[in-house]
């Protein structure tokens, strides 16, 4: 059990996208976020109080959460100075990085000496089965994106919150470190051995009531040459009844891949749906979620209207305008 509240460590994140773990906690569990701590040159700012370790401890923070999802998940020497000091100040540490806290000898030694706990949420805690493709009861909705970090998690969380408010049976199913830190449960999909990834999603979304919806957090993109494998596992293992297409319209290239263009929503539709229908022949695309954070209000509304007219599906920014219309669309499934 990870003790709350948290002090969110931003490190030397180059931009806000790199701090998506911290952003997710701030937005969906604000009562868990006491403040932030960053290194010189950090390009991310959550708008929380910038604190020293001593100030955060005095404010009641229990765990220092590494809020940065950097490429490769490595723990730098600059970070370690802060992490060691945090342990010495009485903080537990929590991380979703691929480089595990427990595998860093200096951190492990200090944690043992101080009696603190190292939480690696990207470590699978279950021996997952190989997927068998057997149809399960209940309903499932999966968010798929044109790229990484376009709002797939936010879409699923917003839809789950809206459904809970309406009294509709639903569960957000976390598949990445941010979602796991928000909800306290889930599958760290990109740390699961490849042959068992689809099976882990079957495990995460078991038989349920016929009127219950699993809102499955999407990962990666079918079009991203680095991370498409996890997306395929979700598309097949999740057996979705409904897909939500997710897009960020101001991207000039794929995240971390400057030589690769971002696909259109039409391309995503035409690739994702046949793949999903391989596992569930009745799967439908029911709506579009657009991350309009870099657009002004009028520009965002105009863009959503254009997309809706072009695609023939409800198009919304669930964070900006709510997820009501996306939830309405599920009623027809």
From Swiss-Prot:
Catalytic activity: D-glutamate + acetyl-CoA = N-acetyl-D-glutamate + CoA + H(+)
Pfam families: DUF1611 (PF07755), DUF1611_N (PF17396)
Effect of residue 190 to A: Small decrease in activity
Protein task: N-acetyltransferase involved in a deamination-independent D-glutamate degradation pathway, named the DgcN-DgcA pathway. Catalyzes the transfer of the acetyl moiety from acetyl-CoA to D-glutamate to generate N-acetyl-D-glutamate.
Pathway annotation from the record: Amino-acid degradation
Family assignment from sequence similarity: Belongs to the N-acetyltransferase DgcN family.
Domain of life: Bacteria
Effect of mutating residue 125 to A: Loss of activity
Keyword annotations of the record: Transferase
EC number: 2.3.1.312
Record keyword Transferase present: yes
Transmembrane segments: none
Protein's UniProt name: D-glutamate N-acetyltransferase
Name of the top EC class for this enzyme: transferase
């Amino acid at each position: 059990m990870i003790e709350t509240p948290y002090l969110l460590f931003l490190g030397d994140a180059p931009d806000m996208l790199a701090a998506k773990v911290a952003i997710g906690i701030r937005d969906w569990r604000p009562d868990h976020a006491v403040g932030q701590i960053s290194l010189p040159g950090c390009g991310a700012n959550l708008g929380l109080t910038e604190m020293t370790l001593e100030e955060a401890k005095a404010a009641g923070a229990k765990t220092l959460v590494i809020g940065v999802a950097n490429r490769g998940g490595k723990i730098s020497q600059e970070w370690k100075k802060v992490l060691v000091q945090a342990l010495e100040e009485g903080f537990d540490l929590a991380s979703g990085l691929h480089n595990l806290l427990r595998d860093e000898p200096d951190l492990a030694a200090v944690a043992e000496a101080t009696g603190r706990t190292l939480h690696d949420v990207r470590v699978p805690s279950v021996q997952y089965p190989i997927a068998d493709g057997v149809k399960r009861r209940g309903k499932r909705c999966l968010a798929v994106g044109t790229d990484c970090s376009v709002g797939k998690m936010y879409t699923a969380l917003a839809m789950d919150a809206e459904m809970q408010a309406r009294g509709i049976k639903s569960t957000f199913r976390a598949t990445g470190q941010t979602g796991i830190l928000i909800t306290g449960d889930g599958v760290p999909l990109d740390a699961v051995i490849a042959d068992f990834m689809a099976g882990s999603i079957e495990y995460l979304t078991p038989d349920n009531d016929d009127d219950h919806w699993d809102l499955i957090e999407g990962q990666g993109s079918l079009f991203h040459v680095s991370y498409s494998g996890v997306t395929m596992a979700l598309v097949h293992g999740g057996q979705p009844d409904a897909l939500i297409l997710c897009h960020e319209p101001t991207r000039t290239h794929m995240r971390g891949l400057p030589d690769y263009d971002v696909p259109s929503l039409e391309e995503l539709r035409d690739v994702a749906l046949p793949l999903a229908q391989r596992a569930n022949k009745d799967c439908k695309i029911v709506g579009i979620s657009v991350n309009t954070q870099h657009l002004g209000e009028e520009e965002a509304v105009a863009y959503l209207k254009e997309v809706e007219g072009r695609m023939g599906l409800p198009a919304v920014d669930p964070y900006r305008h709510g997820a009501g219309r996306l939830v309405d669309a599920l009623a027809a499934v």
